[in-house]
Amino acid sequence: MTDVALIDAGGANLGSVRYALERLGVDARLVRDAAGLQGAQRVILPGVGAAPEAMSRLRAQGLVEPLRELQVPLIGICLGMQLLFEHSEEGDVECLGLLPGIVRHMTPALGIRIPHMGWNQLVPMRDSALLAGLPERASAYFVHGYAAPVTADTVAACDHGGLFTAVVQNGLRCGAQFHPERSAETGARILRNFLEMSFP
């Protein structure tokens, strides 16, 4: 993979995602405007924080429409994945609308703490090259208080007081709710799969 664009949307995990890519032998270039997307073969949208601020930053950078029109594979990570959906309850904000569904606040319950923090098991829902090479009952590291619903696009779910989307794919649009850069071999494998897999 010769040209990977890493969008700087102000997420605190930007540096750790970049380092995770470096461990895979990928020198991703930081993108802060639409011109930076030119020539990219893969685009990564990381994010930590709140959806309204992240969408405001993408708008200020002139990246909202270019991301909506992108014709190369894109993966959103953590908040970046949530931004791929139509809408988020967090701040009642319109998102990129690349995937159907509304991101909703997770509901606390007896024994269920919100935000969801820590390791949790992935529950495969359908075949996707994103999961290639993962062992059964693979786990990943999550930190989030909002979650996307399980839809026909869900590749893997996770259960924390109810199922939510952990890995998603619709054509060129992919996402991981967990932090691949903090998820050891599981995270490295999914990042590598995204970079190397063939897309329809």
From Swiss-Prot:
Residues 3-200 form the Glutamine amidotransferase type-1 domain. One of its GO terms (biological process) is L-histidine biosynthetic process. Its EC number is 4.3.2.10, 3.5.1.2. It catalyses: 5-[(5-phospho-1-deoxy-D-ribulos-1-ylimino)methylamino]-1-(5-phospho-beta-D-ribosyl)imidazole-4-carboxamide + L-glutamine = D-erythro-1-(imidazol-4-yl)glycerol 3-phosphate + 5-amino-1-(5-phospho-beta-D-ribosyl)imidazole-4-carboxamide + L-glutamate + H(+); L-glutamine + H2O = L-glutamate + NH4(+). Gene3D superfamilies: 3.40.50.880. It is found in: Cytoplasm. InterPro entries: Class_I_gatase-like, GATASE, Imidazole-glycPsynth_HisH. Signal peptide: none annotated. It comes from the Bacteria. Pathway: Amino-acid biosynthesis; L-histidine biosynthesis; L-histidine from 5-phospho-alpha-D-ribose 1-diphosphate: step 5/9. Heterodimer of HisH and HisF. This is Imidazole glycerol phosphate synthase subunit HisH. It comes from Xanthomonas axonopodis pv. citri (strain 306).
